[in-house]
């Protein structure tokens, strides 16, 4: 595989000294996470470098820009496209890269082989940590933005240098010579074929996939697939979704996230922005822009949209005794679980004093937030309030859900343990967000915990409108049998010892995620 200086030098889990925008190196010097976008200018400001700059600002990252083309565009149509001379693009690149400490370069519209060539030359001279390639050829609105003449240089020169590429299904098809991509299975096949062209990671976006009830993107790291699902949002304001997603990935990488976490944060950001902007009106055409600054204008709306039922897919419940047994901190355990594919974290602490637990939980909240993963506190709503955690999980003997809701407010996640149909009905009435049902199988994690079996789990699912996560004695050997019960509101499994009573949390999380993904695809 080719290399551009430092582009290939950073590991998948590379991190800066903090996950925030600025890192204090001395009392007077701060390092700022920096992205350079190399893309076209959009006069309507919904896509292109204008969108890239807004995204980076919203994510707390500095963004410089290099224009490759100037588009006259509004919500009705593209009126004209003017390509900048390669020399002009090269001068812009040298100007920025020779002065700024750019962490990540994100590319958008690269409209000619000559412009791709000057980009490659400058990156060879001025290496960066990561390269995010959004192969802009066909926009969300269907406009062709790059001709077939640059396909060969993309395949042969640019893609082998990319840390991640983010084509939509039309662009993926073009890169693969026009192959048919109309199903999730075909998206997975396309991602695998694109990976063979050299990028370290591939994200095939399925937002415009025909006959799909939800929005699904397929992520491939060369070994494992991750399907990222979210509900389709009915809105005309979808202009610039591809630019926004790729720029958000670049911003998160610049801050130090690993690739999968960056992708998850970016998808969540796009979904939240689309939902927040679904009713705004800018322009009179068929495809409007959306608002990238929702977290500043309406933080409540932004927080309310963070939890999705699919977050329950691989639910990791920590156990301090198990982590001590394997000589690791709760912080290291949470990091490894997330990197391995955990989609939500619950901190369960029964031994530590309040202050000790508070300090541990604060670090875990920061880790989860930087990786776009929700964190819940078991029982301790006081800790959840103090740290502004995403929510809590309570049992039947804990404070009632309706009272917890009155304390936490409407935007927090509340889960409740249920073993019976009656408890499941009550959880819905009291305003819970999800149900944890079990123990499905015998377990040593909780003393005197009654096992309900697969039939009991099925009854709880049938009795409730809420999403359900199964818990109790679940691991790699039996997770598939749990997911096979066929209830649509069963969204995942919660595990304790299957992750944390193991020598390597990362390895076990990856194996379990793979098992669940394959089970979901088969059923």
From Swiss-Prot:
Q: Which cofactors are named for this entry?
A: Mg(2+)
Catalytic activity, as annotated:
2-[(2R,5Z)-2-carboxy-4-methylthiazol-5(2H)-ylidene]ethyl phosphate + 4-amino-2-methyl-5-(diphosphooxymethyl)pyrimidine + 2 H(+) = thiamine phosphate + CO2 + diphosphate; 2-(2-carboxy-4-methylthiazol-5-yl)ethyl phosphate + 4-amino-2-methyl-5-(diphosphooxymethyl)pyrimidine + 2 H(+) = thiamine phosphate + CO2 + diphosphate; 4-methyl-5-(2-phosphooxyethyl)-thiazole + 4-amino-2-methyl-5-(diphosphooxymethyl)pyrimidine + H(+) = thiamine phosphate + diphosphate; 4-amino-5-hydroxymethyl-2-methylpyrimidine + ATP = 4-amino-2-methyl-5-(phosphooxymethyl)pyrimidine + ADP + H(+)
Q: Looking at the keywords, is Plastid present?
A: yes
Q: Where is the transit peptide?
A: 1-38
Induction data: Down-regulated by treatment with exogenous thiamine.
Residues engaged in binding 4-amino-2-methyl-5-(diphosphooxymethyl)pyrimidine: 346-350, 378, 417, 446
* Main location, first listed in the record: plastid
Q: Pathway involvement?
A: Cofactor biosynthesis; thiamine diphosphate biosynthesis; thiamine phosphate from 4-amino-2-methyl-5-diphosphomethylpyrimidine and 4-methyl-5-(2-phosphoethyl)-thiazole: step 1/1; Cofactor biosynthesis; thiamine diphosphate biosynthesis; 4-amino-2-methyl-5-diphosphomethylpyrimidine from 5-amino-1-(5-phospho-D-ribosyl)imidazole: step 2/3
Question: What tissues contain this protein?
Answer: Expressed in roots, leaves and stems.
Provide a GO biological process annotation.
thiamine diphosphate biosynthetic process
Pfam families, per the entry = Phos_pyr_kin, TMP-TENI
Kindly state what the record says about how the cofactor is bound: Binds 1 Mg(2+) ion per subunit.
Q: Which GO terms describe its cellular component?
A: chloroplast
Q: Where does 2-[(2R,5Z)-2-carboxy-4-methylthiazol-5(2H)-ylidene]ethyl phosphate bind?
A: 443-445, 473, 496-497
Keywords from UniProt, A to Z, are: ATP-binding, Chloroplast, Kinase, Magnesium, Metal-binding, Multifunctional enzyme, Nucleotide-binding, Plastid, Thiamine biosynthesis, Transferase, Transit peptide
Q: Where in the cell is it found?
A: Plastid, Chloroplast
In its UniProt record, a GO molecular function of this protein is: ATP binding
Quote the function comment for this protein. Answer: Essential for thiamine biosynthesis. Bifunctional enzyme that catalyzes the phosphorylation of hydroxymethylpyrimidine phosphate (HMP-P) to HMP-PP and condenses 4-methyl-5-(beta-hydroxyethyl)thiazole monophosphate (THZ-P) and 2-methyl-4-amino-5-hydroxymethyl pyrimidine pyrophosphate (HMP-PP) to form thiamine monophosphate (TMP).
- Family label: Belongs to the thiamine-phosphate synthase family.
What is the protein named?
Thiamine biosynthetic bifunctional enzyme BTH1, chloroplastic
Gene name in the database record: BTH1
């Amino acid at each position: 595989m080719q290399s551009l200086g430092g582009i290939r030098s950073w590991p998948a889990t590379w991190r800066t000294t903090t996950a925030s925008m600025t890192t204090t190196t001395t009392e007077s010097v701060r390092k700022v996470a920096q992205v350079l976008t190399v893309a076209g200018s959009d006069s309507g400001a919904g896509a292109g470098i204008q969108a890239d700059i807004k995204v980076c600002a919203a994510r707390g990252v500095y963004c410089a820009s290099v224009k490759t083309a100037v588009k006259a565009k509004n919500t009705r149509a593209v009126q004209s496209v003017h390509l900048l001379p390669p020399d002009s693009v090269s001068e812009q690149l040298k100007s920025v890269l020779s002065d700024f400490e750019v962490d990540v370069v994100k590319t958008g519209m690269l409209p000619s082989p000559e412009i791709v060539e000057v980009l490659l030359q400058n990156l060879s001279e001025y290496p960066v940590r990561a390269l995010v390639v959004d192969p802009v050829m066909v926009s969300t609105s269907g406009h062709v933005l790059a001709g077939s003449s640059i396909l060969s240089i993309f395949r042969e020169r640019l893609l082998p240098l990319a840390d991640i590429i983010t084509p939509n299904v039309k662009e993926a098809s073009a890169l693969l010579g026009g192959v048919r991509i109309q199903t999730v299975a075909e998206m997975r096949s396309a991602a695998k074929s694109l990976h063979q062209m050299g990028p370290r990671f591939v994200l095939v976006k399925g937002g415009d996939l025909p006959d799909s009830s939800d929005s699904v993107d397929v992520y491939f790291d060369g070994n494992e697939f991750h399907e990222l699902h979210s509900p389709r949002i009915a809105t005309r304001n979808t202009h610039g979704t591809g630019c926004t997603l790729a720029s958000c990935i670049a911003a998160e990488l610049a801050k130090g996230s690993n690739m999968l976490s960056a992708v998850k944060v970016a998808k969540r950001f796009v979904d939240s922005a689309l939902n927040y902007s679904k009713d705004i009106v800018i322009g009179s055409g068929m495809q409007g822009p959306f608002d990238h600054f929702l977290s500043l204008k309406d933080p409540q709306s932004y927080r309310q949209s963070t939890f999705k039922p699919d977050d329950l897919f691989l639910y990791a419940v920590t156990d301090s005794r198990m982590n001590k047994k394997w000589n690791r901190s709760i912080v290291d355990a949470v990091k490894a679980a997330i990197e391995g594919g955990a989609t939500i974290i619950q901190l369960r602490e029964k031994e530590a004093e309040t202050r000790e637990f508070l300090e541990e939980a604060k670090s875990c909240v920061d880790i989860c937030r930087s990786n776009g993963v929700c964190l819940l506190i078991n029982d301790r709503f006081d800790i959840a309030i103090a740290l502004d955690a995403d929510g809590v999980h309570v049992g039947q003997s804990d404070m009632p859900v309706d009272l917890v809701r009155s304390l936490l407010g409407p935007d927090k996640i509340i889960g409740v343990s249920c073993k019976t149909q009656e408890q499941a009905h009550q959880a819905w009435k009291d305003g819970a967000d999800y149900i944890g049902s079990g123990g499905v199988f015998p377990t040593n994690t909780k003393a005197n915990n009654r096992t309900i079996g697969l039939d009991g789990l099925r009854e709880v699912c049938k009795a409730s409108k809420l999403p359900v996560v199964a818990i109790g004695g679940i691991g790699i050997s039996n997770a598939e049998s749990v997911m096979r019960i066929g209830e649509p509101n069963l969204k995942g499994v919660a595990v304790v010892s299957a992750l944390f009573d193991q020598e390597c949390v990362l390895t076990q999380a990856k194996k379990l995620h793979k098992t669940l993904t394959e089970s979901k695809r088969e059923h």
